């Protein structure tokens, strides 16, 4: 089991307690259901997540952005998930509750402090680097040094496959989180379902199926929008088809990387147009709900004090050793910078000097410590 308990006092934050399972435990538990001797397998994780042993193959389904509370709220649109509603467990993702951090935690079993995957973007080379792409940055295996579960399986001559669109094959995130698995390109949900079934029927021991479209719809149109609901319903229908066609002996586990909330545009603060936040700040990175602040040399305490004064109860601000308490031990805290700003309520912080207008205008976002963002589902489907 991962050591993910957080002892910080952050009123209103939904953080894991000692012994609570995390996203870092999902693959370890799943592997134990097919062979507890596999590299990275954990019988303890399997037991904590309700995963029974005795399977011959493992199918891991990760639905980007479909947090536990969203499944509960929109269960009327998901007849397939509604049938297993009582079996869906609520566990925690990592901090920050965002794709780059969480999928890498899923793929390695380690929290962001160890993987350096600490947000959507990070300060790098005098600018800001997007961790999903890592364009112009180091090789993913250099930035993120922790071996993935898939690398460890490959070293033991156990094959694995990742089913996702072709555009993800060479991405920074794929290299950081999923390296070691063979990439199987498939575009639509039907194509991905068919590809996953082919891999299972061919005997591939571990198959990972990724669905990003619900998250994309949330970013573009908001949670609960027509587009978001259409994508949710499409996924549920595809899941039904997949489950009807599974070969015998497959353990199927579905989870997500994080949840999502709709922000209130009137509560978004722009660093570029707020002198008290802008002064003394070298670089702002991260994302709207989980902001990395890098102060000018020698000004960190002064800058943090001003940010606390300006933002007040609209954000949790964490600095020093407290950052590692949130994200896990390792070099990730240094990557975040002088302090981390995690939005409360439905607000956030942006910087129009480095962020595009479309990114700033996203109605659906994530990254912070609310239960809607932090709670993710785990359900054993077969």
Located regions from the model:
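Feature captures the catalytic ectodomains and active-site-proximal regions of enzymes
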Residues: 1-382
């Amino acid at each position: 089991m991962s050591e993910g308990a957080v002892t910080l006092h952050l009123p209103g934050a939904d953080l894991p307690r000692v012994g609570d399972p995390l996203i870092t435990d999902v693959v370890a538990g799943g592997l134990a259901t097919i062979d507890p001797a596999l590299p990275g397998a954990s019988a303890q994780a399997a037991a904590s997540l309700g995963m029974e042993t005795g399977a011959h193959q493992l199918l891991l389904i990760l639905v980007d952005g479909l947090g536990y509370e969203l499944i509960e709220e929109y269960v009327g649109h998901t007849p397939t998930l509604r049938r297993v509603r009582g079996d869906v467990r609520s566990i925690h993702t990592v901090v920050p509750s965002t794709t780059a951090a969480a999928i890498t935690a899923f793929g390695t079993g380690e929290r962001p402090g160890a993987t350096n995957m600490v947000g959507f973007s990070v300060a790098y080379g005098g600018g800001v680097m997007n961790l999903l792409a890592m364009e112009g940055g180091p090789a993913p295996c250099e930035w993120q040094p922790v071996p993935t579960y898939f690398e460890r399986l490959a070293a033991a001559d156990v094959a694995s496959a990742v089913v996702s669109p072709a555009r993800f094959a060479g991405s920074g995130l794929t290299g950081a989180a999923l390296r070691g698995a063979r990439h199987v390109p498939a575009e639509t949900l039907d194509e991905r379902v068919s590809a996953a079934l082919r891999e299972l029927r061919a005997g591939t021991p571990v198959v990972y199926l990724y669905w990003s479209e619900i998250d994309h719809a949330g970013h573009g149109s908001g949670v609960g929008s027509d587009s978001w609901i259409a994508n949710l319903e499409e996924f549920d229908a595809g899941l039904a088809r997949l489950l009807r066609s599974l070969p015998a002996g497959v353990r199927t586990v579905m989870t997500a990387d994080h949840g999502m909330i709709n922000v209130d545009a009137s509560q978004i603060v722009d660093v570029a147009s707020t002198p008290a936040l802008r002064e003394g700040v070298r670089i702002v990175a991260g994302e709207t709900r989980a902001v990395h602040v890098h102060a000018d040399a020698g000004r960190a305490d002064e800058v943090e004090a001003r940010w606390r004064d300006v933002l007040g109860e609209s954000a949790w601000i964490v600095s020093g050793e407290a950052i590692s308490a949130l994200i896990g031990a390792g070099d990730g805290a240094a990557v975040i910078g002088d302090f981390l700003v995690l939005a409360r309520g439905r607000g956030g912080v942006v910087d129009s000097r480095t962020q595009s207008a479309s990114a700033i205008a996203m109605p659906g976002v994530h990254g912070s410590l609310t239960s809607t963002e932090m709670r993710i589902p785990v359900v054993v489907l077969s």
